[in-house]
Amino acid sequence: NYDQNTKEKTTKPSVRYAEGQSMSAIWAVRSLGIDPGTGNELFLTKDGYLTYTWDSDDQIVCGDELPKYTGTFGFNLDWKGFSVNTSFYYRLGGQMYNQTLVDKVENCDMNNVDHRVYTGRWTTPGQKAEFKKMTDPNYFTRPTSRFVQDLSELQMTSLNIGYDFRNCKFMQKGIIERLKLSFYMNDVFRLSTVKTERGTDYPFARSFSFQLQATF
């Protein structure tokens, strides 16, 4: 169910289930970007006509959050007492709606704004801008394909580096049977086609630790 009241008030893509469409489809009105002459956003109706007016009935599927491919891989290396173990995660294909970017720039609280409110928005006729003018008649930015972005990413989810001192000369004295030093880190890095903005979401939980194992 997707009633008219919800369609007109929402500023983010709503979950919609339509026959023959993906359950993770992103519904929005197609956008041609910001008109350099007026600073208003230029839309395409579902029939292909140009308009400055956002209409909920013109929403179509503009992307899908479900990636085409996902997977994990890693490698292990042991050499002269050194060991390296890594794990990676990847996703290819699919899209995301960059809602945080919308909320920080075009739907922002004017008492707490992002610098792009002043540097990235349209101000002068003929200007090519990423964001619409502040006096756009469609004041609140509603679901638009302008913020649907292709998402592919690679994450290094864990890294473990260790050194086993078993071949060191001091180990031959027999006081210590085994000694190994290890370093562990998770969420090492993320490479993404979308500049992810956390907003009020939890930050990426990167952590690291050292471990010393000794056997006497």
Q: Where would I find each of the regions flagged by the language model?
A:
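Conserved small-residue
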Residues: 1-65
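Outer-membrane beta-barrel pore domains and translocons
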Residues: 78, 89-91, 184-188, 215
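Extracytoplasmic gating/loop element in the C-terminal half of outer-membrane beta-barrel translocons
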Residues: 21, 25, 36, 91-179, ...
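Outer-membrane beta-barrel "beta-signal"
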Residues: 159, 204-216
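Flexible, surface-exposed loop regions and adjacent strand-edge segments
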Residues: 2-11, 94, 101-110, 194-204
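Outer-envelope beta-barrel architecture signal
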Residues: 69-71, 80-82, 152, 175-179, ...
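Repeated loop/turn-to-beta-strand initiation elements of outer-membrane beta-barrel proteins
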Residues: 81-85, 168-170
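Membrane-embedded beta-strand positions of outer-membrane beta-barrel proteins
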Residues: 86, 181-183, 212
